[in-house]
């Protein structure tokens, strides 16, 4: 019985929201790979997405905290010699390090799934994850400042 934390990012507002996903919805994520897209209708109980919106899987992390790596096939956990992200940010150019990563496929040992909302091309409505009160206040002040 898998349980995931889905971190859903909204490119229109720049905000992210975290959801807890349990069975039977969690079963639909098993076997998906980084870059796969799902129809946004499957999250209708958690968040209201615009018609035609999709969800693209961008990554995740395992129970031990190892990030999913798009270059490692399958639902495995292995060490790679990393020279850059994801999973390792070298302090100097050319440095490499042996790092533990997860494969690019979601399994029941994945705890967190990162995803982004993909809006239809003709969508012009408000963002699915709205701006918070602080951001709205900043926008309001920015609009008033040039008028003075």
From Swiss-Prot:
Q: Which PROSITE patterns match?
A: RIBOSOMAL_S6E (PS00578)
InterPro entries documented for this protein: Ribosomal_eS6, Ribosomal_eS6_arc, Ribosomal_eS6_CS
Q: Name one GO cellular component term.
A: ribonucleoprotein complex
GO terms classed as biological process: translation
**UniProt GO molecular function:** structural constituent of ribosome
Q: Which UniProt keywords apply?
A: Ribonucleoprotein, Ribosomal protein
- Please give the family membership noted in the entry: Belongs to the eukaryotic ribosomal protein eS6 family.
Name this protein carries in UniProt: Small ribosomal subunit protein eS6
The organism encoding this protein is: Pyrobaculum aerophilum (strain ATCC 51768 / DSM 7523 / JCM 9630 / CIP 104966 / NBRC 100827 / IM2)
Supply the source organism's classification. Answer: Archaea, Thermoproteota, Thermoprotei, Thermoproteales, Thermoproteaceae
């Amino acid at each position: 019985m898998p349980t995931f934390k889905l971190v859903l990012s909204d490119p229109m507002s720049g905000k992210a929201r975290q959801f807890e996903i349990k069975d039977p919805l969690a079963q639909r994520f098993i076997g998906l790979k980084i870059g796969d897209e799902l129809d946004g209708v499957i999250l209708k109980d958690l968040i209201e997405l615009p018609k035609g919106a999709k969800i693209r899987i961008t990554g995740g992390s395992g129970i031990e905290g190892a990030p999913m790596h798009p270059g490692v096939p399958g639902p495995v956990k292995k060490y790679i010699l990393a020279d850059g992200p994801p999973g390792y940010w070298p302090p100097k150019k050319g440095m490499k390090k042996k790092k533990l990563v997860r494969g690019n496929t979601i399994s029941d040992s994945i705890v967190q799934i990162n995803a982004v909302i993909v809006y239809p091309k003709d969508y012009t409505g408000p963002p699915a994850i709205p701006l918070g009160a602080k951001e709205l206040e900043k926008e309001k002040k920015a609009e008033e400042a040039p008028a003075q």
